[in-house]
Amino acid sequence: VKKFLIFLLVVIFLTINESFAQKVSLPVWYIVQVNIKNLSDLNYLEKQGYSVDFFDGKYARVYIPETALEKLQSEGFELQVIGTDPSPYIEKTPSGYHNYAEMTQFLQDLANTYPNLTRLISLGQSVQGRELWAIHISDNPDVEEDEPEFKYISTIHGDEPIGTELCLFFAEYLLQNYSTDARIKNVVDEVSIWIVPLMNPDGRELVTRRNANGVDLNRSFPDYPTDFNTFYYDGGNLSIETREPEIQHIMRWSLEHNFSLSANFHTGAMVVNYPYDNDGGPSGVEAPSPDDALMKWIATQYAIHNISMYNSTQFPGGITNGAAWYVITGGMQDWNYRFTGCIEMTIELFNTKFPAGSWIPTIWNDNRESMLSYLECVLRGVRGLIYDRNTGEPVWTKVLVQGNTQPVFSHPRVGNYHRLLLPGTYNLAFTAPGYIPYRVNGVGVIDGWATRRDVPLSDGDINVDGKVDDEDVELAVRVILGITPIDKDIDVDGNGLGASDIQAIINQSLSIPIAIFP
């Protein structure tokens, strides 16, 4: 009987969806509710490449191709077809929502109205030729400044458009209130803010989770360790050529900048999901990152201002570790953190994937303070400029915290770095090819604005003759012994002027590796 009922539902969905599917040239996927008897079922579905989209502890919402329906039934899964993707029932532009053209006009109007604070750029085109718009908000939008970079991205899944509306409203909110609200003026003056309201414009127009090639973009980013096993800075494989166009554009853009904090918006639940989504373990098991405590704190800064989210009965405090909820492969947030050093979280805004337009004002009101508070988190931690002490030029550098395996990186063109940290005392190290590692110990981080520590890196050439040799060692010895006064700082390793500087210069001249944290 169950199989017959499922068959009838499928026939109904297919009949309604047939002409629609032909128009968009996308194979229809079924949205099924699967009874998860144990977590191994959830892991199996993920490993089969199906898009698990929600899990409440008993039932999972899963997107599957047509061919998988009978297969899962034959394997003993209890499931119910609850919809199709694309959906024939949802209007392309329900009342209250912006379609792609209207969104484009909205962004262009903002850029024209606030030319001193904004720049609107295209990151590239989608499969069907639509622009992926990014609006840059800054007090100096044409200048790369010594300040942290932040981004909001929405609607990587085209059937989850409420985040697009919130991104538009948030951009407008910042710009309209810049001249009258000191708090907003502060974040616009001190942060380079980027907003991509619609990452999957084709999917949004077609009312589908996927892009126009039928690919789930949030299951298609390079995955660790299958696609890369080290950071981009250390030569990690970008693995971009085989990616979907929308992913290629986001990856290139992310690596052209130096983002410290990010979030991407979804719907279908109400929770802030923080990394890791996948560390090789099973669903339902915590996969903590090296910055787990920091991430929980940042996630809470969003959730606590959204009362419904914060009071969730499923997710205590409105936050969850990604893998503890359910594992995904190829997600954007893990790629950002593991590959570029940018902390990114996935924020689920509403339990309904495509709420009626009448809900939009309420959802915006519930999330406005959360969006601003989350953005303000990027101003915390430790920051500074890293430069060549002989030339003053910026140095692209890896920044490490003792006891934490996840580095961040400085901006290659500006030289600024920003390391998000909780209040406490930390030992930092700064390393770059061709330079002596530099350490700064006992850095105090307060509950407020970031502590500043600028870092002058040395290649060991302290007499500035273009090479590192015995003459540099001899000069260092004479300065340390007080024989030869010198008006420049030759503390090349950050440990104070002493024998370690001599040893560092010797090692540098002989190309001997120098310990970062002895």
Predicted segments, located by residue:
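Short helix-loop-beta-strand segments that form the rim/entrance of peptidase-like active sites
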Residues: G163-V207
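Bacterial N-terminal signal peptides
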Residues: I6-T15
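A short, solvent-exposed beta-strand micro-motif common in secreted/extracellular proteins
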Residues: P423-G434
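Metallocarboxypeptidase
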Residues: V191-V196, D202, R210-Y387, P394-W396, ...
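A short, amphipathic beta-strand motif
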Residues: V382-R389, G415, V455, I462
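Structured interaction patches on ligand/partner-binding surfaces of diverse proteins
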Residues: P433-G460
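Alpha-helical segments with a strong preference for the paired helices of cellulosomal dockerin domains
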Residues: D465-I486, D493-F517
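Short, acidic Ser/Thr/Gly-rich low-complexity loop/linker segments typical of extracellular
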Residues: E393-P423, G442
